[in-house]
């Protein structure tokens, strides 16, 4: 069973934080070669703080995926780290949350679930369920072109707000990730096609999905 749940930075155990930060280093530094700061084999930054909430996907006690949420009213990567990568960045007004540090650990997923699995789409769905549960207007995030393609293929009805250039002169995008019924239904349909999960049980958080 894959369980995805939300937990605040303040309530995370040191062991679980270390596990997440180590997996983030594996993804963002070792695999993607992003310009991130790493200490003692872990990747973390100033946005991992008391204003942060994480979604954690856990299988057999091990984290296999995660994403970080920060309410847009607090310091975040859109208004901080990435702001200079856009010309006159225009952030929509409203009760939004920013998402960042999205990852699915390939090795752990392969070992614990197998190669054909809906782990990524399930984490997308959990993001929608979280935003709906806490009554946010939607999710704002900045992504690379490969991540943009992945989101589009999932069926999520995303929209591009603005395009910028990263420090590597690669295209990046400020996106609005909506929490509408159509988007949620599209993701649920993808998951039910690959698992024995029932549609109604996928509309909650914590999110439980029967996986091998």
UniProtKB/Swiss-Prot annotation:
EC number from the UniProt entry: 2.3.1.184
Alphabetical list of SUPFAM superfamilies matching this protein: Acyl-CoA N-acyltransferases (Nat)
Catalytic activities: a fatty acyl-[ACP] + S-adenosyl-L-methionine = an N-acyl-L-homoserine lactone + S-methyl-5'-thioadenosine + holo-[ACP] + H(+)
A Pfam family reported for this protein in Swiss-Prot or TrEMBL: Autoind_synth
PROSITE patterns with a match to the protein in the record: AUTOINDUCER_SYNTH_1, AUTOINDUCER_SYNTH_2
Keyword Transcription: no
Keywords noted in UniProt: Autoinducer synthesis, Quorum sensing, S-adenosyl-L-methionine, Transferase
Enzyme class: transferase
Molecular function in Gene Ontology: N-acyl homoserine lactone synthase activity
Gene Ontology BP terms: quorum sensing; signal transduction
Highest taxon, organism lineage: Bacteria
Keyword Transferase found: yes
Recorded family membership: Belongs to the autoinducer synthase family.
Function: Required for the synthesis of OHHL (N-(3-oxohexanoyl)-L-homoserine lactone), an autoinducer molecule which binds to the EchR transcriptional regulator.
Protein name: Acyl-homoserine-lactone synthase
């Amino acid at each position: 069973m894959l369980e995805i749940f939300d937990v605040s930075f303040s309530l995370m155990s040191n062991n679980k934080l270390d596990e997440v930060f180590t997996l983030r280093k594996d993804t963002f530094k070792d695999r993607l070669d992003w310009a991130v700061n790493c200490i003692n084999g872990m990747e973390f930054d100033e946005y991992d703080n008391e204003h942060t909430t994480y979604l954690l996907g856990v299988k057999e006690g091990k984290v296999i995926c995660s994403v970080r949420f920060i309410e847009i009213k607090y310091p975040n990567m859109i208004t901080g780290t990435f702001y200079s990568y856009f010309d006159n960045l225009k952030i929509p007004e409203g009760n939004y949350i920013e998402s960042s540090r999205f990852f699915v650990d390939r090795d752990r997923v392969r070992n614990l679930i197998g190669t054909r699995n809906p782990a990524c789409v399930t984490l997308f769905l959990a993001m929608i369920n979280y935003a709906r549960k806490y009554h946010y207007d939607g999710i704002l995030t900045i992504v690379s072109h490969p991540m943009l393609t992945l989101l589009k293929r999932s069926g999520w009805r995303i929209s591009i707000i603005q395009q910028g250039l990263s420090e590597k002169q690669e295209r990046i995008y400020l996106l609005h990730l909506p929490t509408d019924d159509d988007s949620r239904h599209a993701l649920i349909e993808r998951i039910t096609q690959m698992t024995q999960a029932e549609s109604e049980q996928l509309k909650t958080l914590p999110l439980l999905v029967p996986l091998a």
